[in-house]
A protein has these predicted regions:
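Aromatic (Trp/Tyr) and acidic
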Residues: 49, 55, 59, 65, ...
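Glycine- and acidic/polar-rich repeat regions and solenoidal domains
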Residues: 37-49, 53, 63
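Acidic/polar-rich alpha-helix caps and helix-coil junctions
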Residues: 1-41, 69-296
């Protein structure tokens, strides 16, 4: 069963109402929930914490939750509304609760917790659509894509393979100073038809939709690594213009490797060979698996 998007979209955007509803065990679409020690419910949600390195205006409108697809603009077409506030640089979907466990209430210290819906109906449909597209069963992939469109759009509309292909073939490939939703698959782990083919365009559509629907859930890096997508670190000014491109994660950059847990490294297992780099501000970025825009 899919999420009741009408009921969810009617919930208050403030406090913990939407995040708590998102990870509710009563939701039949949530197949697996996971509670972890994490501050992401504050960093990636409606708190000033982490505001400098935020999911901000430029990436929101150029690449994901307010970007354009064959369906129109994501922030007006889809039932999942974008949270924004003129006092914060962040724009996001509200999904991850922030809970704090006090170990000493008087001292105000303890541990931050977050809860994630790590396996859902919508995620399953997106992954099956991708699997169909990779196996060459393009119409079956389109059918799954349209199943999501029927439940996720305010005014449901479905699309043919030709409509999807025509749209994405009409979009320029991403460059760091002219970002789009369409990325070069530089070194994918799969065998994919040439750029401009029906298969490649359909995969662009599926990855675009997944990036919108799963924003803030931690899955994007998997797509980045599997498809060999280059990521750039950019600076934006107060007018949301890209003022500088300061770094990149190329396909073979060792920083793309996920580091082993500290406890197993301490026990003697050799860590993955990652590197520390300096940004232009002179700050050390150690094990930077994700690179965010900096808003000055």
């Amino acid at each position: 069963k899919a999420r009741d998007w009408d009921a969810y979209s009617a919930l208050n955007m403030n406090d913990q109402i939407r995040p708590e509803a998102w990870v509710s065990a009563d939701e039949k679409c949530n197949f697996l929930l996971q509670t972890v020690y994490s501050e992401w419910g504050a960093i990636g949600e409606a708190y000033r914490y982490g505001d400098k390195y935020a999911h901000s205006y430029r990436i929101t409108y150029d690449e994901d939750i307010a970007s354009k697809g064959p369906f129109g603009a994501a922030n007006t077409t889809f039932k999942q509304r974008v949270w924004s506030n003129n006092k914060l640089a962040k724009l996001f979907h509200r999904k991850v609760p922030y809970e704090f466990e006090y170990t000493d209430l008087q001292a105000g210290i303890g541990f931050a917790h977050a809860e994630y819906a790590v396996f859902t109906t919508e995620q399953l449909l997106l992954e099956r659509a991708e699997a169909y597209a990779l196996s060459g069963e393009l119409q079956k992939a389109v059918d799954d894509y349209n199943t999501i469109m029927k439940i996720y759009q305010n005014y449901p509309k479905t699309f043919t393979l030709k409509q999807i292909v025509d749209f994405y073939n009409g979009v320029d490939y991403y460059t760091p100073k002219k970002a789009t939703v369409k990325k070069h698959f530089v070194k994918p782990v799969y065998t994919i038809d040439a750029e401009g083919s029906d298969q490649e365009a359909l995969l662009q559509a599926i990855l675009h939709l997944r990036r919108i629907m799963e924003v803030g859930e931690g899955y994007r890096m998997q797509d980045v690594k599997r498809y060999g997508i280059v990521i750039y670190r950019r600076q934006t000014n107060t007018s949301f213009t890209i003022s500088a491109v300061t770094d990149s994660l190329t396909v073979d950059d060792p920083r793309r490797a996920i580091q082993l847990p500290q406890d197993v490294i301490t026990s003697g297992l050799e860590p993955n060979d990652r590197i520390a780099v300096k940004d232009q501000g002179g700050n050390i970025m150690q094990d930077s698996g994700f690179i965010y825009e900096i808003k000055k």
